[in-house]
C-alpha cells in the first residue's frame, strides 16, 4: 500500500512538472505581446515591425510540428525532453544577449523548434505518466498549465520587462526552464517511444469533413483574435493614451477572465460544446467591434477584456475537445495538426495586425479582426448544424 501511495505521488509529480513545462513553453510564445514597445524602442524600430517576430515564431511552430513529430517518433522520450530543454534554455540565453534584432529572431526560431516538438509529445506523455484511472485529470493539468500562461505568464513577463528590461524577461524564462529540467531529470523514468502517429493516419484524418471543418474554423477564429490581441499593449498606450501599467493590468484581467471561461466550459462543455463555441465566437466578434469605442474609457476597456478573456478560453478548449472527439484513433497526429493550425492562425493574426498598424492605423486592429470573426461565426453555425453530434457521440468512449 505504501509503495503504491509513493508511486502515485511520484506519478502526479511527473505530471505536475510537465504542466509547469507547458506553462513555461506557452509563456515564452506570448511574452513578446507585452514587450513589443520596449523591444522596438531598444532597437529603434516600429512596434509593427517587431510584431513580425510573433508571426515568424508561430509559423515555425506550425510548419515544424508534424515533421519534427515524425522525425523524433522513435527517440526515447526522456532523452528527447532533456534535449528540447537544453535547446530551449540556450536559445533564451541568446535572447538575453541579442545584440541586434536579427539575433533575437534567430534565438526565437531556436525556441520555436523546441516548442514544436514539445507540444507534439506532451499530451501523450501526460497520459502515460498519470496514475491509473486519472488520464483525464492529467490532461486537464496540462491544459491548466497552458491556460495559466495566458493568465499570468504574459503579465508577469511584462512586469519583469517593465522594471528590469525585456532581456530579463527572457532570462527569467530560461532560468525557470533550467529548474524544470532539473526536476524532469530527477523524476522521469526511461520512456520508450510508443503510439507515435505516422503519416499513414494523415489521409484518414483529412477524409473526415467534421474534423477538417473544425481545423478551418480554428485558423479563422484564431486569426481574428490575434489580429487585435498581438497589438493590445501598443494599442492601449498609443490609441487609448493610457499608461504602460494599465496595459499590464488589462493583460492580467484578460488572462484572469480565461479562468472563468475554463470553469464555464468544464461545467457545460460536454453537453453543449457546439452552442458554447458559437456563443463565444459571437462574444469575440462583439469585443473586437467594441475595442476602439471602449478605448475612450478605461473602465469600458477593463469590462471588455473580461468578456474577451472568457470567449477566447472557451474557443480554445472547445476546439481541442472537438478535435479529440473527431479523431479518438489518432490523437497524437490530430493534436499535432491542431497545434500547427492554431499557430498558423496566431502568425496570420500577428501579420494582419502589423500590416493594419503600418498601413491603416493601430486604431483599426479591432475592426479588421472582426471580419474573420464574423466569417468564423457563420462557419461555426453551419458546421455544427451539419455535424451536430460528432462530439457527444465519441465523448463517452474517449474519456
From Swiss-Prot:
Query: Keywords on this record?
Result: Cell inner membrane, Cell membrane, Membrane, Sugar transport, Transmembrane, Transmembrane helix, Transport
Gene3D superfamilies assigned: MFS general substrate transporter like domains
Q: Which Pfam families match?
A: MFS_1 (PF07690)
PROSITE patterns membership: MFS
Q: Which cysteines are joined by disulfide bonds?
A: none
Task: Give membrane topology per the record.
Answer: Multi-pass membrane protein
- Where does this polypeptide localize? Cell inner membrane
Q: Per its UniProt record, what InterPro entries does this chain match? A: MFS, MFS_dom, MFS_Efflux_Transporters, MFS_trans_sf, Sugar_effux_transptr_put
- Give this protein's Gene Ontology molecular function annotations: carbohydrate transmembrane transporter activity
Note the superkingdom of the native organism. Bacteria
One GO CC term of this entry? plasma membrane
Which regions span the lipid bilayer?
15-35, 50-70, 81-101, 103-123, 136-156, 168-188, 209-229, 246-266, 273-293, 301-321, 333-353, 364-384
Q: Which HAMAP family match?
A: MFS_SotB
What is its biological role? Involved in the efflux of sugars. The physiological role may be the reduction of the intracellular concentration of toxic sugars or sugar metabolites.
**Which family does the record assign?**
Belongs to the major facilitator superfamily. SotB (TC 2.A.1.2) family.
What name does this protein carry?
A: Probable sugar efflux transporter
Specify the taxonomic lineage.
Bacteria, Pseudomonadati, Pseudomonadota, Gammaproteobacteria, Enterobacterales
Gene name, Swiss-Prot/TrEMBL: sotB
